[in-house]
Amino acid sequence: MATMREPRFKLSRRLGVNIYGHPKAMKRFETTNTRKKKISDYGMHLIEKQKLKAYYGVLEKQFSRYVKAAMKNKEASGSSLLKILECRLDNVVYRIGFANSIRQARQMVSHGLILVNGKKLDIPSYEVQVGDVVSLKEKHRQNEMFSNNFMNLSTFNVPYIEKNPDEFSGKLLRLPNIDEIPIKVNEVAVIEFYSK
């Protein structure tokens, strides 16, 4: 499992974005970051790359593979990269609302709690395809934390995923449009970082 060694709140404040969705993550940043340091173009590109890696919890080796795949795609490389990341199984589990963070979603997948089209899949990086149905194993649906998350989390109700409360599942209806992905990042700068 990908692990980030820097404390989560500290990393969020350093990158200037709440990558973990915790309400207290940016508290100190808002009160202390009144004067911004001038950042070079290289520094800006690096921050955008680190922001995207940290948000999706992907380490450098795998992230660079995603970038290479995106650069081979016919559509804009930045858009393609975001779509690849957004379709990771751990992220889809998070978007559906089974978990309150991508980190928690990754643990659920790794521990075999998640089904894709009715079959257990324990690979967080698995690329969910359009039409795939992702569900929670039936024996875990009574777990209070998972059921509360699924029924109550509306932070990431996204139009490209259809939730089915009766079946504890979500279906990837289509690939997302860039403006629908709930993270503010300069994806073009990320591609440019790897193009140099």
UniProtKB/Swiss-Prot annotation:
Domain (S4 RNA-binding) ranges: 87-149
Function according to Swiss-Prot or TrEMBL: One of the primary rRNA binding proteins, it binds directly to 16S rRNA where it nucleates assembly of the body of the 30S subunit.
rRNA-binding in keyword set: yes
Record gene name: rpsD3
Protein name stated in the entry: Small ribosomal subunit protein uS4C
Record organism: Clostridium acetobutylicum (strain ATCC 824 / DSM 792 / JCM 1419 / IAM 19013 / LMG 5710 / NBRC 13948 / NRRL B-527 / VKM B-1787 / 2291 / W)
Family assignment from sequence similarity: Belongs to the universal ribosomal protein uS4 family.
GO biological process: ribosomal small subunit biogenesis; translation
A GO cellular component annotation in the UniProt record: small ribosomal subunit
HAMAP family: Ribosomal_uS4_B (MF_01306_B)
Complex and partners: Part of the 30S ribosomal subunit. Contacts protein S5. The interaction surface between S4 and S5 is involved in control of translational fidelity.
Database matches in CDD domains: S4 (cd00165)
Pfam families, alphabetized: Ribosomal_S4, S4
Keyword Lipid metabolism set for record: no
InterPro entries on file: Ribosomal_uS4 (IPR022801), Ribosomal_uS4_bac-type (IPR005709), Ribosomal_uS4_CS (IPR018079), Ribosomal_uS4_N (IPR001912), S4_RNA-bd (IPR002942), S4_RNA-bd_sf (IPR036986)
Superkingdom of the organism of origin: Bacteria
Gene3D superfamilies the record matches: Ribosomal Protein S4 Delta 41, Chain A, domain 1, RNA-binding S4 domain
Keywords: Ribonucleoprotein, Ribosomal protein, RNA-binding, rRNA-binding
GO MF term (any one): rRNA binding
